[in-house]
């Protein structure tokens, strides 16, 4: 008996690429004017090279909310944070930008993919879960 594939059944890298292209094709996400000049955190020295980085981050965040609900802006700042290089001084962990995470979560809310959770953070909606599972079903699984 063949069952439908979910987000958990496919490779994370393949899913994020496929869902990012789906978000770009749908045209429901409005790119802010600052996407080409903003850094993704104070730990970064330059803005992202990939012009579609905003769609990739949105797809990754939607996948993370799908797999583990209750994630808010602070959790995403920790997830996408990293090591800040301080020159000759030792490196330390630094959080990523909260404005980017907040803006993407608000965009996903307007698309009805995520919603506010009463316990805090965001959770996936039923239509969002169906949308993500449809994209996952289109991805071919390598044996």
Curated annotation (Swiss-Prot):
The keyword Ribosomal protein applies. GO terms for molecular function: mRNA binding; structural constituent of ribosome. Keywords: Ribonucleoprotein, Ribosomal protein. Gene3D superfamilies: Winged helix-like DNA-binding domain superfamily/Winged helix DNA-binding domain. It holds the Pfam family Ribosomal_S19e. InterPro entries: Ribosomal_eS19, Ribosomal_eS19_CS, WH-like_DNA-bd_sf, WH_DNA-bd_sf. This is Small ribosomal subunit protein eS19z. The gene is RPS19A.
């Amino acid at each position: 008996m063949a069952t439908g594939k979910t987000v958990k059944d496919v490779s994370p890298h393949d899913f994020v690429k496929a869902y990012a292209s789906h978000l770009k094709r749908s045209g429901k996400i409005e790119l802010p004017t600052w996407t080409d000049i903003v850094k993704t955190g104070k730990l970064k020295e330059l803005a992202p090279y990939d012009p579609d980085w905003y769609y990739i981050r949105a797809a990754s965040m939607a996948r993370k909310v799908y797999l583990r609900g209750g994630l808010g802006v602070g959790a995403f700042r920790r997830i996408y944070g990293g090591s800040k290089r301080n020159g000759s001084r030792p490196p330390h962990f630094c959080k990523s930008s909260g404005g980017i995470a907040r803006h993407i979560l608000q965009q996903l809310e307007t698309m009805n993919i995520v919603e506010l959770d009463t316990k805090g953070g965001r959770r996936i909606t039923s239509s969002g879960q169906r949308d993500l599972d449809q994209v996952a079903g289109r991805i071919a699984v390598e044996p």
